[in-house]
């Protein structure tokens, strides 16, 4: 079933976008460039190849790290500024 948008949810989405854009539009990486501690602690149980979906990946620190581990990663985030930084981090790391 398709979701019906109402003006309230659209306003909420726009304010959320503004909030995340404000967070990620700065030059520095809000959470750094290294992966989340929990994700990194799971390295031993990750497959050596395959696909991964990094949802709400922000500036890409987790998705890029997963790609460095040999996975084919799709990284998604709500913020265009975060997506831009994620692509830059991936280029910097060669993945």
What are these regions (language model features)?
Residues 2-47, 49-58:
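Conserved class I S-adenosyl-L-methionine
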Residues 48-49, 69:
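Residue-level preference for short coil/turn positions at secondary-structure junctions
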Residues 59-71:
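Conserved SAM-binding loop of SAM-dependent methyltransferases across substrates and taxa
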Residues 72-77:
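Conserved SAM-binding motif I beta-strand of class I
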Residues 79-81:
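Conserved SAM/SAH-binding beta-strand->alpha-helix loop
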Residues 86-87:
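Conserved SAM-binding loop
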Residues 91-95:
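S-adenosyl-L-methionine
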């Amino acid at each position: 079933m398709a979701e019906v948008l109402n003006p309230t949810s659209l306003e909420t989405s726009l304010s959320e976008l503004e909030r995340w854009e404000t967070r990620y539009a700065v030059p520095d990486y809000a959470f750094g460039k290294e992966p989340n501690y929990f994700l990194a602690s799971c390295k031993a149980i990750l497959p050596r190849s395959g696909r991964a979906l990094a949802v709400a990946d922000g500036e890409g620190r987790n998705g890029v790290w997963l790609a460095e581990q040999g996975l084919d990663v799709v990284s998604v985030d709500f913020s265009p500024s975060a997506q831009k930084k994620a692509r830059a981090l991936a280029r910097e790391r060669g993945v």
